[in-house]
Amino acid sequence: MSLIVQKFGGTSVANTERLKNVADIVTKTAQAGNQVVVVVSAQGDTTDDLIVKAAELNDRPSKREMDVLLNTGEMISMSLLAMAIQKLGFPVVSLTGWQIGLETNSNYSDARIKRIAGERLKAELDNGRIVIVAGFQGINQMGDVTTLGRGGSDTTAVAIAATLGADLCQIYTDVDGVYTADPRIVKDAKKLDAITYDEMLELASLGAQVLHNRSVEMAKKYNVDLEVVSSFTRNSGTKVKEGSNMEKLNVSGVARDNNCARVAIINLDDTPGTAFKVFSLMAKHHVNIDIILQSVGRDNKKSISFTIRQDDAERVESILRDAKEMLGYEDLSINTKVAKVSIVGAGMASATGVASKMFEALAMAGINIRMISTSEIKISVLINEEDSEKAVKAIHEEFFNA
């Protein structure tokens, strides 16, 4: 007997027919002799609809009250799915985040999991029940309900799998695995049978919407085997697991991130501590920095460029203009019409010529590179946003079809 945690997203439980489909998947897993815990998200656009309803009453509601409201979406899904499974004749119980003892900090709307008590889950499983859990939610030390922010249901599923020592955590989505590129851009993108935690983390951080990076980080930390599968087909999915015994591809995937902006601070004093002033200011205002480039000019001056999320561009411009005298720069430029395109591969660390092939593909496609960033398993380039789709296609062709 195996213990399997299955997570179903909003599209998978969006309506009655899809709930029946999920009930069929879950009960077939149980019929195969497995203990099953299911984590569900809110149906379809439920969360967005609740946010709209709140805004109609108050355009600045407290995060605490928003968490109370948004918790209801997952509770609707869990109870409806439990009813569908009851109809099929299986013993089942639905539980909220606080009923399973999922304890969080008090950072409303983006809480972090501290622990899951686990006793209630184990008791229900030992009694032969399928357990349905509302994802995305927990409870803080004051007894207030909280929500876990983006990717919260994925994170709930992995946390439960880690707590119970599950044999597998399956993430059901509207795609049947992890591909070498976005199939909507690259028609001949190939599905990967397996990928390492580190590769999946990089792809998730680059905007691949299959898994949220918080859940992958937790899976890696607690060595939880993941599988990405489709709710709508019975095709095999992609396994995400420790890569030590896997044959490592030089490049496993190509990804793009259009939520980028390039900040250039021009003609700063070329003296010790200048970079510290810039980036401590960004840290103070909780701005995430990605690629950094420093270039030395004339007359003891230098320029510093870095990339941020496009969502932060206006705020960062205001922060830097207010700090112009303190930083002592001559000019400031912010470009929001850029994109980051990256290749990821665990085998890259021991391979030669990977960067050369990537840059050749971009050159042949007539695409100019503005910034470059590398790590042991990733190479990223910043390019014009209008070239991002063409870049993904060209790089994918070079590495997977040449």
What kind of feature is each model-predicted range?
Residues 168-172, 226-228, 290:
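Short hydrophobic alpha-helical runs that function as membrane-insertion/retention elements
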Residues 237-402:
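A conserved regulatory-domain signal marking ACT and ACT-like small-molecule sensing domains
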